[in-house]
Structures are given as C-alpha cells and as structure tokens.
Amino acid sequence: MSGELANYKRLEKVGEGTYGVVYKALDLRPGQGQRVVALKKIRLESEDEGVPSTAIREISLLKELKDDNIVRLYDIVHSDAHKLYLVFEFLDLDLKRYMEGIPKDQPLGADIVKKFMMQLCKGIAYCHSHRILHRDLKPQNLLINKDGNLKLGDFGLARAFGVPLRAYTHEIVTLWYRAPEVLLGGKQYSTGVDTWSIGCIFAEMCNRKPIFSGDSEIDQIFKIFRVLGTPNEAIWPDIVYLPDFKPSFPQWRRKDLSQVVPSLDPRGIDLLDKLLAYDPINRISARRAAIHPYFQES
C-alpha cells in the first residue's frame, strides 16, 4: 500500500506546513521521468503510539481524488511506525504569497478573482461529491501552478490527523477562515464549513486584506458579528444549541456587503452573501456556487 522513502531524493526544505516539514524532492521511481514532487513529513502528536491505522485509511482515500483543481497525492510512504510521508504534486506558489507579490494598492483584477473563485468552487465541489471535507481552507493551502491555475492542497488531512490548535512549529493555526458553527463549539458540521471559507477568501482577494481577522476565538466571532450582524434564533434556529453561543453577546447591526467589499459587482455581492450565510443549511453549496450568475459573462 505504501512506497519506499528511497524512491525519493530530497533536494531542499521548502516550507513548514500545519503538520510538518515540506521538502522539494525528485521521484526516482521508474517511468516517472524524475519528476519534482513535494514530500510532506507528517509529525504526529503522539509520537509513542505510531501512525494510527485510521489515518492511513483516510489518506489512502485521498489518492483516489483526481481533479484539475486538486493537488494530486501520488504516494504514501510509511517508513517506520512513527513516520509518515505524503508525496504530492509540486507547486511552489500559494495564494497568500501570490497576493503578497502584488503591491497592496493594486487590485488582483476582477478576471483573476473570478477565475480563482471558479477553480476553488469546482475543486471543493469535487471533494464534497466524494464526501471529503477540507476544514482548514486558507490562502496558504491554495496553490497556483505555472499556468496560473489554482489547485487545492491539504484536502482531507484534517480528518486523518485532526486540525491542531497550533502547527507543529507552535505557530497558531489561523481562525480567519473558520465557520461560525465551528467557532461556537459545534461538533456536527458539514460541507458548509468549506463554503464559508470560500466566502472569506473571495472577500480577501477583492479587498487585499482578510475580511475577518480575529486573534482569538471570541475576537474572531465578534469580528464576524460586526460585519454580518449578531445572529439570532430567527435567522439561525440551531444557534441556540451551539455550546459557546450566549444570548448575552453584544448586538451588532449588519453592514451592507457592497460597502464592505466595494470592488465587487452586484452578482459578486450576491454570491458572497450566499457563501457567508450564518445558518449552514442556507449556505450555498460549492456545486451551486460554481454555476452562480457571477460567473456568467457580463
């Protein structure tokens, strides 16, 4: 089921992800033409217990995901009881770095935003159709290839390994793209957690800065409330069942999204509004988002 570490020649360390170090490597297996791959070393919380078999099963499912908008997982290397390496298609640019490379006073451009959004919605829709959630979507794990197309990375890893509070580097894992049902302590969540994140990324591509940039869970919740208004049972009936919801939360009024994201046309605002619906039941699906009028030629 898993390959051998000797099949890969490490070239250099290229980064540190949520779960461990990422290396640029050569795939030495016959017939692969020495292609360049990303070798992700997974550091597991409980070093003493080894790699859980559930994680291996989950990750094996990810090898079946084959879509233009998803970073391919080529191989799984379980070198010993404690170490796991995932071998992915290599892409050296992510959306965060891509945006940082464009001067802050310049827009990304409406056409680029629309193209990336379409690729993001299609990639998520594909994964959701295979019953796989991402749960940790953010610009850092949206990768851009040399043709300028966007692909989703780190899909399904959250279910296999959990979403840690801190990355193994002790850097706090960002809350900026996290759905309100998760922030409010909900344990039963579904595909809506990813479509919320798409909405946050959409607004960020337009505004060139995060729409909700909290530095703690409560700050994140209040940042959302300040823009979208404090939710109540009328607009989100199940909110009262979320463990961390308090009727005593400060009451903010909703802002007009067209003033929050002024560069977006009315169709774009409508899509953003549907992605950032409070009640996950009312949140647009990725499949429906991909056929929203925003994407039609205007």
UniProtKB/Swiss-Prot annotation:
Pfam families: Pkinase (PF00069). InterPro entries: CDK (IPR050108), Kinase-like_dom_sf (IPR011009), Prot_kinase_dom (IPR000719), Protein_kinase_ATP_BS (IPR017441), Ser/Thr_kinase_AS (IPR008271). PROSITE patterns: PROTEIN_KINASE_ATP, PROTEIN_KINASE_DOM, PROTEIN_KINASE_ST. Gene3D superfamilies: Phosphorylase Kinase, domain 1, Transferase(Phosphotransferase) domain 1. Its EC number is 2.7.11.22. The modification N-acetylserine is found at residue 2. It comes from Saccharomyces cerevisiae (strain ATCC 204508 / S288c). Disulfide bonds: none annotated. This is Cyclin-dependent kinase 1. ATP binds at residues 14-22, 40. Cyclin-dependent kinase that acts as a master regulator of the mitotic and meiotic cell cycles. Required to drive the G1-S transition. More than 200 substrates have been identified. Substrate specificity is in part regulated by the bound cyclin protein. Phosphorylates YTA7 during S-phase to promote transcription of histones. May phosphorylate CNN1, to contribute to the enrichment of CNN1 on anaphase kinetochores.
